[in-house]
């Protein structure tokens, strides 16, 4: 049997995607719409306390295209906290006019493919802790997509010897390092949590960098032979002070 890679796991992750029911929302009286927006602002401000106490974080983006209008991404120490957040959000008045289009449940993950041998507790390493329990950037743009490692009769990632997988992931990682300073990447593991095996969330102030890195990685053997992808979601940051303009009709 092929050897499984060990993982380090951090905060639990929930991506929520919604479309706005503009047809119905425009029928609501202006005062009621404003009250809904104020309630949403209060909800988001309340969730920002977790960032300040380093007990989680969140990001909100306006999705481009017809797959969704909004992305809300939450990180928390325990899965049940994500349930509480989702339940609380669904009880907001404005949620009556938001149509769920997609969601993704996962956990911030680092694999040991590129790790060197050490007796150190990795969870005490400041660099590792910063990646497992991150402070999300407030970049202009976001890109999210789920992915699997291919497993069929011709190419089966999980049947490769671990040394071969380490080599492939090293070469794969070298491409990503070329985009340091341009893209911030977060990998979340979802085996047993959702329909794909990983979620990839990218942040950048230059949206074109998403196209460049994904295209370049298409030529990497790890992706070309073993990568399978779901839908891609691209969005622009939606700050709390932008809510009124976004929901105005």
UniProtKB/Swiss-Prot annotation:
Which Pfam families did the record assign?
A: Chlor_dismutase
Q: Which cofactor does it need?
A: Fe-coproporphyrin III
Could you give a single Gene Ontology term from the biological process aspect?
heme B biosynthetic process
Write out the catalysed reaction: Fe-coproporphyrin III + 2 H2O2 + 2 H(+) = heme b + 2 CO2 + 4 H2O; Fe-coproporphyrin III + H2O2 + H(+) = harderoheme III + CO2 + 2 H2O; harderoheme III + H2O2 + H(+) = heme b + CO2 + 2 H2O
Gene3D superfamilies, A to Z: Apc35880, domain 1
Superkingdom of the source species = Bacteria
Record keywords: Heme, Heme biosynthesis, Iron, Metal-binding, Oxidoreductase
* Top enzyme category: oxidoreductase
By sequence similarity, the record places it as follows: Belongs to the ChdC family. Type 1 subfamily.
Question: What protein does this entry describe?
Answer: Coproheme decarboxylase
Q: What is the organism of origin for this protein?
A: Staphylococcus epidermidis (strain ATCC 35984 / DSM 28319 / BCRC 17069 / CCUG 31568 / BM 3577 / RP62A)
């Amino acid at each position: 049997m092929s050897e499984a890679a060990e993982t380090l796991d951090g905060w639990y992750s929930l991506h929520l995607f919604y479309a706005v029911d503009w047809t119905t929302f425009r029928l609501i009286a202006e005062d009621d719409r404003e009250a809904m927006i104020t309630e949403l602002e209060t909800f988001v401000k309340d969730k920002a306390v977790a960032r300040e106490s380093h007990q989680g974080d969140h990001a909100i983006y306006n999705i481009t295209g017809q797959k969704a209008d909004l992305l809300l991404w939450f990180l928390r120490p325990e899965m049940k906290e994500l349930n509480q957040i989702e339940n609380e959000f669904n009880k907001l008045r404005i949620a009556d006019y938001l149509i769920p289009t997609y969601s993704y449940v996962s956990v911030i993950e680092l694999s040991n493919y590129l790790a060197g041998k050490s007796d150190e507790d990795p969870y005490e390493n400041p660099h590792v802790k910063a990646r497992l329990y991150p402070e999300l950037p407030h970049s202009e743009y976001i890109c999210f997509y789920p992915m699997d490692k291919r497993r069929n009769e011709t190419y089966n990632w999980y049947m490769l010897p671990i040394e071969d997988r380490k080599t492939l992931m090293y070469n794969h990682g070298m491409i990503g390092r070329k985009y340091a300073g341009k893209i911030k990447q977060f990998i979340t593991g979802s085996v047993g949590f959702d329909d794909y095996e990983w979620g990839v969330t990218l942040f950048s102030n230059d949206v074109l960098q998403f196209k460049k890195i994904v295209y370049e990685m298409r030529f990497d053997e790890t992706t070309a032979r073993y990568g399978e992808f779901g839908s891609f979601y691209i969005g622009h940051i939606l700050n709390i002070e932008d809510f009124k303009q976004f929901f105005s009709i």
